[in-house]
Amino acid sequence: MARRSQSSSQGENPLDPNYLPPHYKEYYRIAIDALAENGPEAYEQFLMEEGAPDFLCPNEVEHISRSLQRPPESGQENPYPDSVYGSQEDADGSSGTYWPMDSDTAAPELDLGWPTIYGFQGTEVTTLMHPPPPDNPTIKEEVRRMIRSAQQVIGIVMDIFTDADILSELLDAANRRIPVYIILDQMNCQLFLDMAAKYRVNLNYVEFLRVRTVSGPTYFCRKGSTFKGNLQEKFLLVDCTMVLSGTYSFMWSFEKIHRSIAHIFQGELVSSFDEEFRILFAQSDPLIPSESALAKMDKSYMGMVPFAGPRPMFDRKLHFMFPREENPSQQFPSYGVDPDRHYFQPFRREDMIRQTMDPGGMRMYGKNLGDPMDKMQMSFVQNKQLEAMEAFKRHSFAEGTFENYTSSRQYSRQMFMNNNDEYRLQSSQVQKSQFMQFQSPLGTARPQGLFEKIRGGRQGLQEMDEFDSRYPTKGLPGEGHFALDGPPMRPGYNPSNSSREVRHGSDQMVIGGEGRFGQRSLGRQKFMCQISPTQKQGMEPKYFFHDQDADKKPQENKQGLRSWRISSYLSGIQSDQDEEGLPIPLDPELYDDALVPVERAVPASDTLFKYSMDPVPPYHPGTAPHDLPYDRANENPMKFSMDPVQLHRPNVPSQDVPMHLERAGNESLVKYSLDPIPPFKPNVAGTDVPMPLERKPTANEILSRYSVDPIPPYKTFGSTGDLSVEKAKENPPAEKEKEEGLLSRHDSFRTRTNPLIQRGSRLRSSLIFSSSKLEQHTSTAESVQEMQKEQSTSELVSENETGRTTSKVAEILQKYRGINKDANSTTVTQAKAASRTIHEESEDGQSVSAEEVAYKAVESTVDTKGSMSHVQQESQYRSVASSHLESLLGKHQTTLSMSKVEQMTSSIQTIGNISAAPSESGPTVPELSEVHKQSSISHMQQESHYKSVVTSKLEGLLNRDQQVMSMSKVEQTSSTIQTIGNISPAPPDSKESGPTITEVTEATQSSENLPTRPNSAFHFGSALESMSQNPTPSSSLNKSEEDLAKTDQNFFRKGSMRLKQFLQSKAEKKAEEDLASDNAKAEKQHSTLRRLSKSDSQEVAASTDMEEKSAKSLSVSPPKTSSISQSRLSASTSNVIFSSNLRDDTKVILEQISANSQKNRAEMVKQAQQIQATGDPDPATSKPESKTEGTASTDAAAITRTGSFLSRSRFSRPSPSSPEDRDILLKRMESIRKEKRVYSRFEVFCKKDEQPSHADDNDDKKAGKIIPKLLGNLIKK
């Protein structure tokens, strides 16, 4: 039995269902050994004795007999030097029994380069048959198409390659500088070499072609004999993204007589072929060409002529058609320096003479418009005349070569004699396609400018109009530089600035920068002056050794495109630069947009002296037109005198100035400018007057072409009155227009700054309040002046939505314009408290009043025009809405039905929409005060009659309906009132139109006798007090609404739902717009905010002390008050979301407000005491009300007690102005926050999103619990 190490089925389980029995048979091995040692007869004899069938076909027997290699005998010369039994044993003393895992011989390298594929776009397989179905291409056609479409690399693995058509395609691809790797079968490679010899192709001189051979696995016999197999893999790999694999071989017979199949794989399956090709190439051996392939050829054009298509129009001697002559005594080979080898150089070159060997980076095509040329009589000998002119040609794409022509040519001769090693590329230096695509200069003109050339991918190509008349065509008889109409060129060339950009990246490239040997050429860029700025090289030593430092000029006021984009982007992040990242000179230059260096202009005499040795003929009027620079736009040869040197030289007639003087002036000035496109219009020939600067379209004009909402000019937006007026005084109109252009241009390039990101910093809030101390004690006259200035500015704003949208852009732009420049020119909004009340009349004449308080703390918003215009909108809205409401109430004060309630609510919203439009035109302050005064007088006339009607109706309702309605009806009506009060708020003045309780009516009536300034502050404080201390009007009105809903419940329910849906969007929009106020009302806001914060904290603290009592009074009216508290909290915090971090910054805000508003609070207390002393409660109203409450129910009595508590405690509470009271207040607020009684911003976000999607009942359940508890406790008292 065999040992375990000798078992071929080691590790396999015979009981496994997937077990595959081994197919190895011992007599196979013995029969092969007999065949290898003694021949076919011994093989057949062994099979006959063994009784086994023949397992080899005759072809296999013949192959083994033909390819068998026997081991060398001792003392006998090895007949197989390339076999595994070479003389290596004697050299290194290694034993034949030692088999290392890794070879110490380096694997061959893919020296022409190999692309790296990082990802695939899916997998696609296409099956090809031969012969093909009808209307389908053959496999050979697909092979040729794939080779022609190659851009990076071509890899072929083939057993037999004898198809000349495919070889012609491969040579064409190699001539396009695409690496071509061919791996052939080692035994059949001679067939490929014979085909190359037949068509006169010398494979040693095809630069981008590598041919290697691979054999099959080696079989080792018992006595040391070996034989190898064939390479039967067949596939074509193109760009590592496409593979054609199958049974098709590159032979004539496979195209004509054999049936075959092939598959085209695209996608991820190509990676396996990629790996297999690199493995085969690493195991391959070099191809040994035959002597016939290296034989000299007598006829030049015998090679590949029938297969290369039509002959070119000029002698394009292919370098692989000329054998190398081994004649070291001759300086140059007889076939000379091939122009194609000169022209098609490697994409990146590391040697020092790359510019000399790459003359101009392209073939200089030109056209002699005057002399006809015979294209068929050109020869390579005539082309060699250009060698003496190479120093005068433009340099290649990169710097770093010898400027001395003699030394460079001597170095070039040495390289040519040294096996052309300088033309070998490294493995990492493959380029997609470097075959130039040329365009006829007589065709359609391409767009000028650097950016258009970059987009078109034609930056390095030159056209005929860019060649000047420096080199007369008579120096090259019989040709106009080169033939213009050559063979058809292939597209896909992506030129680069230089090899330095490819290796080091484009971020280190400087447009127009200097190389290692002086100023770099800008010849590959188009210029509007139609004259190439490339400095032509003279043969004098003065030019080669001129002072390079004298040419260097610092560029201070101009930057490259990349630097400008970087600074423009950084200006959106760093706001410490003046003009959005552009360095602005202190004094504006007269020609700031000119491409002239700021320091000094180059004198024309210096330029003439420097280039006086140039072989340039002076200009004469009789010169032929084709010798002048060709202007493609105007067809005028003389219209090129628009050089920037005219701005700095005396007015000399252009006829008296030589052409090379003007050209040198142009070149010296444009040479040192980073922007190669001068913004000047062409001057008329013969005039030397400095041309005016071409007006550039402003940024707004450019944006208006591509955007729906163009940005209005910046002057329309002015930050505040002072800022806009002072800026207009400081800057003249020209500077102001320039300034606006800079701002708008930078703003169009960078991303808009999100105002929501720059929020919520405690330090920022404290700094804002500390800076606002300087502005708190401004006089009333200054405030009125600011308001008037702002009014005049706001009149320029359009009345459509575009003006409102772009005002936010103006706010963002204004942030970056010196906030710290002038403290008086900016207004910092500190805080704002807004009280809105909406009143509606019920069927019985009872007033529905729902108040909401929006507490806003704006931390870091610098006011622009929007703040003043918004204040004016509010004041006008109050006056118009209150007067309209009072007129409506006067008409329908006795017989208002439920339908009238809905009509009136819609009227309120209509007034808000109508009054919003006129408010943008900017009404003056006297108009606002006059309207407000008229509305107050009309209200006082109607109030006396209205109070009696309301009292009688209320008494009748309470006597008639004493039963408590069900909980569902209460929730429905309360949610409706909450929706009206929350979503459609009116300004505070409108609450005077419909008072319900006697105490509230008298308080508001007496408040109208005050002056204007204390009046607004008093109304503000009254609204806050009434909402924070006791929401009695809401609860009493909700009680009356229960009785009303009982009579007409269905109609009221439908109407409320329609109101809620209709008013939702407008209320949110109004709440968001109500953001800031001006500096004139800062003291009033401080006082009202102080009242709000203390009252809020007190009611929240009271709610925590009396939690156990709130459950008992839940059946009376907690659902109603919950709705009102919800509306109050949601409206206030929804605005706070966009303005401040209330939870983090309230302590700092309250400290600053309380410290700054001591004087105002003292004045408010005095005014409140005066009002309380002069106020006369109406006994006729209070008595019937108390009587009704005593006879009707305990709920009404509780409401009456609450109302009396409101009247007693409204103005009697002393102002806690001592530091101890403030400390107690702050401690309470901190304790409440620790118990999470205050909504955070994130909770408000969630609640705001969930409110519209739930029913009314769910909205009531989600309301805050602070106000209901407080109300319940007050009612129980």
From Swiss-Prot:
Gene Ontology terms: biological process: intermediate filament cytoskeleton organization
Keywords: Cytoplasm, Cytoskeleton
SUPFAM superfamilies from the UniProt entry: Phospholipase D/nuclease
Statement: the UniProt record of this protein carries the keyword Cytoplasm: yes
GO cellular component terms attached to this protein's record: cytoplasm; cytoskeleton
Keyword DNA damage: no
Pfam family, one: SACK1
Region (Disordered): 1-20, 67-98, 717-756, 772-805, 971-1018, 1070-1130, 1158-1225, 1247-1266
Skewed-composition ranges (Low complexity): 1204-1215
UniProt feature, compositional bias: Basic and acidic residues: 724-750, 1247-1263
Major site of localization recorded for this protein: cytoplasm
Biased composition, class Polar residues, residue ranges: 1-12, 777-805, 971-982, 993-1015, 1112-1130
Subcellular location field: Cytoplasm, Cytoskeleton
Protein family (similarity comment): Belongs to the FAM83 family.
Physiological role: May play a role in keratin cytoskeleton disassembly.
Protein name: Protein FAM83H
Organism: Xenopus tropicalis (Western clawed frog)
Name of the gene: fam83h
